[in-house]
Amino acid sequence: MADPRQEFDTMEDHAGDYTLLQDQEGDMDHGLKESPPQPPADDGAEEPGSETSDAKSTPTAEDVTAPLVDERAPDKQAAAQPHTEIPEGITAEEAGIGDTPNQEDQAAGHVTQGRREGQAPDLGTSDWTRQQVSSMSGAPLLPQGLREATCQPSGTRPEDIEKSHPASELLRRGPPQKEGWGQDRLGSEEEVDEDLTVDESSQDSPPSQASLTPGRAAPQAGSGSVCGETASVPGLPTEGSVPLPADFFSKVSAETQASQPEGPGTGPMEEGHEAAPEFTFHVEIKASTPKEQDLEGATVVGVPGEEQKAQTQGPSVGKGTKEASLQEPPGKQPAAGLPGRPVSRVPQLKARVASKDRTGNDEKKAKTSTPSCAKAPSHRPCLSPTRPTLGSSDPLIKPSSPAVSPEPATSPKHVSSVTPRNGSPGTKQMKLKGADGKTGAKIATPRGAASPAQKGTSNATRIPAKTTPSPKTPPGSGEPPKSGERSGYSSPGSPGTPGSRSRTPSLPTPPTREPKKVAVVRTPPKSPSASKSRLQTAPVPMPDLKNVRSKIGSTENLKHQPGGGKVQIINKKLDLSNVQSKCGSKDNIKHVPGGGSVQIVYKPVDLSKVTSKCGSLGNIHHKPGGGQVEVKSEKLDFKDRVQSKIGSLDNITHVPGGGNKKIETHKLTFRENAKAKTDHGAEIVYKSPVVSGDTSPRHLSNVSSTGSIDMVDSPQLATLADEVSASLAKQGL
């Protein structure tokens, strides 16, 4: 087991990431603590795929304690669960669960020691994760004491689970969905619980554990935070978690209550935490959730948070869930933990479905753990459904956690986080090779204690499911390369999986929790192209260069001295004596401007004979306005000779209407001869008036008609006659 521990420590190199993942996923509580080898399931169905059983093959304090934890049974669970019964409104932090070292914290102590050594930030991460999970959960935070109690009861719950190994196996195997991950995760939970139990029972045990406990206190704080996260969201999945069906928790809680009646505290725990199924569910989810996601998403994925919730809600709930798992596990464990079942995430989903089909309880538990797995898959691409490739975090996690198997669920996540997911089979194979090289360090067996055969068994089981291009190791072969691949050190299958995850699987497995840090040799995934580039070309005979005529700059020109040698530049002086220099040329150098023989002669022009134009030089002396120039204006007298027209200048003096000029108007009087068209019996004789100053202009002398009327005598008639004549005249008569 020491070797797995060492490998875990090696993983601790990634511990920062790993711790973060654990805190987020509750892996610190379960994964790290679960990583201690799980005692072989009572039902005898050890997870061939989970390295937990392999790790368990070597008895460890945790292994020994795990049965004890199981034996503690409901009574011990109840006793251990006093803290477990934490008001839902109280968070793990409020309960102080994170402060007091939990069994899970102790179990996580392996990781904690490594963390303490180089991963103190991880504790901060755990706290941060805790807070984050709590805030994410939105559920009331439990006091630190309560959290510890809750997390510890989780350890107690694992004890109950240990009682009913079927449940523990079920937990190990995880939700059937995540046969590889879920199994590892469930096993990891059990182992975590066992580790917690071992820590509780033997906190004073090996100094490594004792020393781990202080360091674990921080991881426990992380665990507590996980618990707090779990507690904070008893019914709510964490951020990354996939929401479970509304009736899912009720079903799981019913199953958990049915199985929990064994322990006095189980009933209350279940009552207080119907999310207990979530606890188991969370554990499985952790197992199934790739560490990459944990590391990448510093926040706890919904599944890890749920596991933490389950833990926080109370170990009693965890116990109930585990008890339910114990009852239900027989069906589920085979489904999740069957060595023959492929570890591929998709197979895990199938396993989850199969486990649900197998038993109503299994279905519930599968829902409890499997929904978390489902949640994890939805949030985490590393889940089996997401990645069947060996690079997937699950396969990487499982192979790397033969010793980690106790923590299969948790370690797979870490492993997946550690393991970069490279899809190329060549890369995976290269990683396998690197893992073989690193087997002593970390990849061969994240936990040195875990036998390669055990790892090979779990790996072989999981690898087929993963459909990893790397060769599947037979159960007994225990190929370290696969473990390395799975561990995720360089396994290309797990995309985005930090190398730290692979370490995590190795850490949780050793029950001794030795803080030995195995130098983690991280072999970057070797791509086929890289190997090709390394290939050396066959030696080719050197061409005969003696007969080859070289180009410029070739060997023939090596002796050539550029710019020197025979080439001579002769400067000949030109005889310029006969050359006439231009102005400013060399001949004129001696010329002193403005001096010497050169003279500019200004000859005045004789202008005496020139007659200047007006304004020219000759007129300079002219004074305008003076002299002989005279302007004469002569007026022409046209009046004498010209007769002006009417209105002309001559008629200016004419006064209209005056003078001797008269205007005569002649009036035509045709009416005198005119007759009316219609003879109305009266002849109107109209006489043009005689213009005279005495008489009216118009005078009717007589009117010839019957009974002629004298117009003069009757002025009215005369007026009437005038009017009639005027009207007729207008009409043109």
From Swiss-Prot:
Phosphothreonine, modified sites: 58, 60, 100, 445, 461, 467-468, 473, 497, 504, 509, 523, 695, 719
Picking any one GO molecular function of the record gives: microtubule binding
Q: Which residues carry this modification: Phosphoserine?
A: 35, 50, 188, 451, 470, 477, 483, 487, 490-491, 494, 506, 527, 529, 531, 554, 577, 581, 585, 597, 616, 644, 648, 688, 692, 696, 701, 708, 714
| Residue windows of the Tau/MAP repeats | 536-566, 567-597, 598-628, 629-660
For this record, an example GO cellular component is: cytoplasm
Disulfide-bonded cysteines:
583-614
Residues recorded with modification N-acetylalanine: 2
Keywords carried by this UniProt record: Acetylation, Cell membrane, Cell projection, Cytoplasm, Cytoskeleton, Disulfide bond, Glycoprotein, Isopeptide bond, Membrane, Methylation, Microtubule, Phosphoprotein, Repeat, Secreted, Ubl conjugation
The compartments listed are: Cytoplasm, Cytosol; Cell membrane; Cytoplasm, Cytoskeleton; Cell projection, Axon
Q: Where is the composition biased (Basic and acidic residues)?
A: 1-16, 157-172, 270-294, 354-366
Tissue-level expression reads:
Expressed in neurons and at a lower level in the liver and kidney. Isoform PNS-tau is expressed in the peripheral nervous system while the others are expressed in the central nervous system.
Q: How does it sit in the membrane?
A: Peripheral membrane protein
Describe the processing and modification events after translation. Answer: Polyubiquitinated. Requires functional TRAF6 and may provoke SQSTM1-dependent degradation by the proteasome. Phosphorylation at various serine and threonine residues in S-P or T-P motifs by proline-directed protein kinases (PDPK1, CDK1, CDK5, GSK3, MAPK) (a few sites per protein in interphase, more in mitosis), and at serine residues in K-X-G-S motifs by MAP/microtubule affinity-regulating kinase (MARK1, MARK2, MARK3, MARK4), causing detachment from microtubules, and their disassembly. Phosphorylated by PHK. Dephosphorylation at several serine and threonine residues by the serine/threonine phosphatase PPP5C.
Query: Where is there biased composition of kind Low complexity?
Result: 479-506
N6,N6-dimethyllysine (modified residue): where? 455, 603
Residues annotated as carrying Phosphotyrosine in the record are 18, 489, 686
Q: Which residues carry this modification: Omega-N-methylarginine?
A: 115, 447, 641
Implicated in which disease? May be involved in the pathogenesis of cytoplasmic inclusions (as Mallory bodies) in livers of mice chronically intoxicated with Griseofulvin or DDC (3,5-diethoxycarbonyl-2,4-dihydrocollidine), a model for human alcoholic hepatitis. Alteration of Tau (abnormal phosphorylation and cross-linking) could contribute to Mallory bodies formation and disturbance of microtubule function in alcoholic liver disease.
The Swiss-Prot or TrEMBL note on domains reads: The tau/MAP repeat binds to tubulin. Type I isoforms contain 3 repeats while type II isoforms contain 4 repeats.
User: What is the stated purpose of this protein?
Assistant: Promotes microtubule assembly and stability, and might be involved in the establishment and maintenance of neuronal polarity. The C-terminus binds axonal microtubules while the N-terminus binds neural plasma membrane components, suggesting that tau functions as a linker protein between both. Axonal polarity is predetermined by tau localization (in the neuronal cell) in the domain of the cell body defined by the centrosome. The short isoforms allow plasticity of the cytoskeleton whereas the longer isoforms may preferentially play a role in its stabilization.
Name of this chain's protein: Microtubule-associated protein tau
Organism, scientific name: Mus musculus (Mouse)
Q: Which gene encodes it?
A: Mapt
